[in-house]
Amino acid sequence: PAFRMRFWNLGANGQVLVGCLASAACMFYLGGKVPDGVVNIIMIVSAIAAGILWAVIPALFKAFFGTNETLFTLMMNYIAEGLVGFFVSLWATDGSGVLRPMSDGRLPMIVSQYFAVVFVAVLITGAVSVYLRFSKHGYEIDVVGESINTAKYIGINVKKVVIRTLALSGAICGVVGLLLTGGINFTVNSELHGGMGFTAIMTVWLAKFNPIMIIATCFFVSFITKGMAQVRLDFGFTDEATANI
């Protein structure tokens, strides 16, 4: 949604990380003390709230002070990494600086470990597609993206649209963090996002900001990435050679 509004949000990595951190905090402090179902509910709310907070901060500065969102959101990534590093060192009981996978408070596994992740991703993609195409908010996002002056002229509250849209983007990133920590890795570290925020920029541009087409471009990028990894193993290519291919 943010890119469709021409708000260049480069902070998805940080927004995902704070979602991971919020989920890990719930698992660490509440896991084993309260029922897992209650922990899961608190995790969901906390991860989404953390993602929203991390996205709304630059949105507020953009809306009220005209701050460059590209630089601001990029810097927020490094702050998120620092926060994660601090809490991991605090929680690591063995002095290794590594938080080992936690067994309590995990999200329930449906069919397989990755099925729920894929299901949620498809569900969010469909919901966002409907939201952008058929809702008043989606129309306002398109108008603001095309021309801020036109949006103001027809009575759209641009500041409100910017903040609301970034809150939605942050919420989605928070859900991603929730799934990474609560459903797949059961821990957190500063590299857990795997650079997916920057990969998402490429897939979104390839899809021309169309949520449904993003599914196809994500598969395309995944095929290339995994295929090149297999080529490297089969033919002994270097990492640099496969990256260039």
Each model region followed by its residue ranges:
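Alpha-helical transmembrane segments in inner-membrane proteins
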Residues: 1, 34, 51, 58-59, ...
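Single transmembrane alpha-helix segments in multi-pass membrane proteins
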Residues: 1-30, 44, 48, 52-67, ...
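Alpha-helical transmembrane segments of multi-pass membrane proteins, especially transporters
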Residues: 12-20, 39, 43-51, 69-77, ...
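Generic alpha-helical transmembrane segments of integral inner-membrane proteins
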Residues: 21, 41, 45, 49-57, ...
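Aromatic-anchored segments of alpha-helical transmembrane domains
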Residues: 23-26, 78-84, 174, 221-231
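Transmembrane helix-bundle core of multi-pass membrane transporters
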Residues: 69-134, 187, 239-242
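Helix-loop-helix "hairpin" substructures at the membrane interface of multi-pass membrane proteins
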Residues: 110-187, 211-212
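Transmembrane alpha-helical segments in multi-pass inner-membrane proteins
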Residues: 167-173, 179-245
